[in-house]
Amino acid sequence: MAIDADEVQQIAHLARIRIDEEAVSGYARDLTGILAFVEQMGNVDTDGVEPMAHPWDATQRLRPDEVTEPNLREHYQSGAPAVEAGLYLVPRVVE
């Protein structure tokens, strides 16, 4: 499936993006190549191939859920102009 300049302009319009006229032919060529590759992948025989979430049979090693950093809230909030109950107070912007 070949994408022409008019289709690139239509896609750009639908995506609400501006494309320079001199770049349209390059985008048309690139999109045509992408669609050809997708078509090629669609023609691959995947019967009997087990779906997988990851190409390697690996598990994520999780560390124990332990506190590793000290609580520095008061230190960080010491420079704030207004704090209440551990929360930063900011000026009201909506009445």
From Swiss-Prot:
<comment type="function">
    <text>Allows the formation of correctly charged Asn-tRNA(Asn) or Gln-tRNA(Gln) through the transamidation of misacylated Asp-tRNA(Asn) or Glu-tRNA(Gln) in organisms which lack either or both of asparaginyl-tRNA or glutaminyl-tRNA synthetases. The reaction takes place in the presence of glutamine and ATP through an activated phospho-Asp-tRNA(Asn) or phospho-Glu-tRNA(Gln).</text>
</comment>
<dbReference type="GO" id="GO:0050567">
    <property type="term" value="F:glutaminyl-tRNA synthase (glutamine-hydrolyzing) activity"/>
</dbReference>
<dbReference type="InterPro" id="IPR036113">
    <property type="entry name" value="Asp/Glu-ADT_sf_sub_c"/>
</dbReference>
<dbReference type="GO" id="GO:0005524">
    <property type="term" value="F:ATP binding"/>
</dbReference>
<keyword id="KW-0067">ATP-binding</keyword>
<dbReference type="GO" id="GO:0006412">
    <property type="term" value="P:translation"/>
</dbReference>
<dbReference type="GO" id="GO:0050566">
    <property type="term" value="F:asparaginyl-tRNA synthase (glutamine-hydrolyzing) activity"/>
</dbReference>
<comment type="subunit">
    <text>Heterotrimer of A, B and C subunits.</text>
</comment>
<dbReference type="InterPro" id="IPR003837">
    <property type="entry name" value="GatC"/>
</dbReference>
<comment type="similarity">
    <text>Belongs to the GatC family.</text>
</comment>
<keyword id="KW-0547">Nucleotide-binding</keyword>
<dbReference type="GO" id="GO:0070681">
    <property type="term" value="P:glutaminyl-tRNAGln biosynthesis via transamidation"/>
</dbReference>
<dbReference type="GO" id="GO:0006450">
    <property type="term" value="P:regulation of translational fidelity"/>
</dbReference>
<protein>
    <recommendedName>
        <fullName>Aspartyl/glutamyl-tRNA(Asn/Gln) amidotransferase subunit C</fullName>
        <ecNumber>6.3.5.-</ecNumber>
    </recommendedName>
</protein>
<keyword id="KW-0436">Ligase</keyword>
<keyword id="KW-0648">Protein biosynthesis</keyword>
<dbReference type="Pfam" id="PF02686">
    <property type="entry name" value="GatC"/>
</dbReference>
